[in-house]
């Protein structure tokens, strides 16, 4: 039976585990820079300049990691 892969969770978990700096663009154009500390189905906790912020996912437009994220190796580890 083929497993479904959740790209969003895989991507965010990799950013969190590898402590990769990320720029988050919100739908209103505002930018947040920092590190993903935690996430769930609706929110993300980002550590930005020593302060933690809880951001709702529906307010996020784009994530831009500081370095490339390989999702293929993560998918292989899950299988």
From Swiss-Prot:
SUPFAM superfamilies, alphabetized: Sm-like ribonucleoproteins
Pfam families, per database record: Hfq (PF17209)
Molecular function (Gene Ontology), one example: RNA binding
CDD domains: Hfq
Domain Sm: 9-69
The organism's place on the tree of life at top rank: Bacteria
Record GO cellular component, one term: cytosol
GO biological process, one term: regulation of DNA-templated transcription
Keyword vocabulary terms for this entry: RNA-binding, Stress response
Similarity annotation: Belongs to the Hfq family.
Function: RNA chaperone that binds small regulatory RNA (sRNAs) and mRNAs to facilitate mRNA translational regulation in response to envelope stress, environmental stress and changes in metabolite concentrations. Also binds with high specificity to tRNAs.
Subunit record text: Homohexamer.
Protein name (Swiss-Prot/TrEMBL): RNA-binding protein Hfq
Naturally occurring in which organism (per UniProt): Brevibacillus brevis (strain 47 / JCM 6285 / NBRC 100599)
Gene transcribed to yield this protein: hfq
């Amino acid at each position: 039976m083929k497993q479904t892969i959740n790209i969003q969770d895989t991507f965010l978990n990799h950013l969190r585990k590898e402590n990769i700096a990320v720029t988050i663009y919100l739908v209103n154009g505002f930018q947040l820079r920092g590190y993903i500390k935690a996430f769930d189905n609706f929110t993300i906790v980002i550590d930005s300049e020593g302060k933690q912020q809880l951001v709702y996912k529906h307010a996020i437009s784009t994530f831009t990691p500081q370095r490339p994220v390989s999702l293929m190796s993560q998918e292989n580890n899950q299988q």
